[in-house]
């Protein structure tokens, strides 16, 4: 049995992923900030754990994720407040990576976005700038660690029903989008596939079944 800890467990992708993993027999712990979200998490088959990664230090996060085989970072400040974006999307994310190393949880899957990185190109006066900077810092740090990392880069997210098919790579264009269902399905396949370690997988909805698309990436 694979034991997976999802940080940001009440997010739309996280809830979908927890259900997929629990349905296939994995043990899932979903770490959430708000105790009122515990019921939603439990309905997926995951075990809710209330812990605020924004305020926990590295040791605190390590305690929350110890005894797991993999960590998925699916948390986010959700835009808006710039200081909180850096606190969650950069600083807490980096602490979670250090925590994974400390806890001996080698597998780490980061949900980022298509085009993330130091050359993200988002202007400073754009409301997305802080998020782009925070994700660039977190992803760059993750690549420097000894973790068995994979970074997922979905394009613009939708709530359309999942097709189970994606297109990996290519250049990002304005019309690109991908369903949250498909992102969760990609994360589930990645967790079960060691060949995706040390890969950055950028993708849209497409025509290739997810297992095949990831085999070719």
Question: In which residue ranges do the predicted regions lie?
Answer:
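N-terminal Rossmann NAD(P)H-binding glycine-rich loop of SDR-like oxidoreductase domains
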Residues: 3-26
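NAD(P)H-binding glycine-rich loop region in Rossmannoid oxidoreductase-like domains
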Residues: 30-95, 99-102, 191-195
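Active-site beta-alpha turn of Rossmann-fold NAD(P)-dependent dehydrogenases/reductases
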Residues: 75, 109-112, 155, 204
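Substrate-positioning beta->alpha
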Residues: 93, 134, 152, 174-189, ...
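Flexible, glycine-rich beta-alpha linker
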Residues: 118, 144, 150-170, 203
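Glycine/proline-rich active-site loop of Rossmann-fold NAD(P)-dependent oxidoreductases
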Residues: 120, 161-166, 190-199
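Short-chain dehydrogenase/reductase
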Residues: 200-208
């Amino acid at each position: 049995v694979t034991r997976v800890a999802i940080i940001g467990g009440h997010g739309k992708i996280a809830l979908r992923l927890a259900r997929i993993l629990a349905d296939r027999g994995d043990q899932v712990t979903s770490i959430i900030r708000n105790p009122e979200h515990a019921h939603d998490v439990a309905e997926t088959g995951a075990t809710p754990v209330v812990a605020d990664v924004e305020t926990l230090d590295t040791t605190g996060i390590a305690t929350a994720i110890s005894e797991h085989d993999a960590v998925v970072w699916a948390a986010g400040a959700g835009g808006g407040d710039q200081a909180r974006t850096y606190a969650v999307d950069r600083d807490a994310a980096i602490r979670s990576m250090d925590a994974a190393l400390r806890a001996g949880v080698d597998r780490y899957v980061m949900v980022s976005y298509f085009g993330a990185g130091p050359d993200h190109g988002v202007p400073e006066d754009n409301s997305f700038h802080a998020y782009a900077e925070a994700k660039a810092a977190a992803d760059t740090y993750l690549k420097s660690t000894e973790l068995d990392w994979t970074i997922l880069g979905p394009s613009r997210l939708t709530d359309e029903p999942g097709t189970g098919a994606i297109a990996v790579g290519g250049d990002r264009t304005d019309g690109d989008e991908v369903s949250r269902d498909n992102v969760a399905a990609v994360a589930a396949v990645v967790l079960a596939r060691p060949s995706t370690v040390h890969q950055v997988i950028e993708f849209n909805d497409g025509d290739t079944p997810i297992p095949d698309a990831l085999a070719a990436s």
